[in-house]
UniProtKB/Swiss-Prot annotation:
Stated role: Thiol-disulfide oxidoreductase involved in the redox regulation of enzymes of both reductive pentose phosphate pathway (Calvin-Benson cycle) and oxidative pentose phosphate pathway.
Residues annotated as transit peptide in the record: 1-72
Subcellular location per the Swiss-Prot or TrEMBL entry: Plastid, Chloroplast
Keywords per UniProt: Chloroplast, Disulfide bond, Electron transport, Plastid, Redox-active center, Transit peptide, Transport
Record carries keyword Transit peptide: yes
Residues annotated as site: Contributes to redox potential value: G112, P113
Annotated family: Belongs to the thioredoxin family. Plant F-type subfamily.
Pfam families, per database record: Thioredoxin (PF00085)
InterPro entries: Thioredoxin-like_sf, Thioredoxin_CS, Thioredoxin_domain
Limits of the Thioredoxin domain: 73-186
Cystine crosslinks: C111-C114
Source organism per UniProt: Oryza sativa subsp. japonica (Rice)
Active site location: C111 (nucleophile), C114 (nucleophile)
Name the record gives this protein: Thioredoxin F, chloroplastic
Amino acid sequence: MALRLSVSSSHGPASSPAISTCRPAACGRFPALLGGGVASQRRSLTVVSGPETRAVIPVRSSGSDTATVGAEAEAVAVTGQVTEVNKDTFWPIVKSAGPKVVVLDMYTQWCGPCKVMAPKFQEMSEKDQDVVFLKLDCNQDNKSLAKELGIKVVPTFKILKDGKVVKEVTGAKLDELIQAIETVKSS
């Protein structure tokens, strides 16, 4: 499920299309959709999920080609897709998942086994609508969260229930991961 984003400005109508799509956790930065180069324009981002508006969020822009959504953005656990998280969005999304099982794929861009598992993890997310699938790039920016979660190798899959890590699978072991998820779901 994608969210429809509409950006508006108090400085008049947009000169380029005002609608884009973005995954919830990836919406921290998105292409600026308004024309003009006025520094620090006040804009708003309307998040629409299904037939109704979910939120109107203030957006700051410094005249570059990107805008940053403020901290007011709501973290939403989404099923049916893999959502990219970071050190700031992970725990709020886990909390919003409530009693649902959450599976976190901790990977790096350069890891061969991680690249092999990525499409399989995506396929799992599309098939299992009862589980929230997340992925975390264990880069320098997310080092603090990776350390907090105790990662030693990549890929590492953390399975959480009620906000707590209850199982872990290390390595590109698809069958073991599927079994671990089923075990946690049935407990």
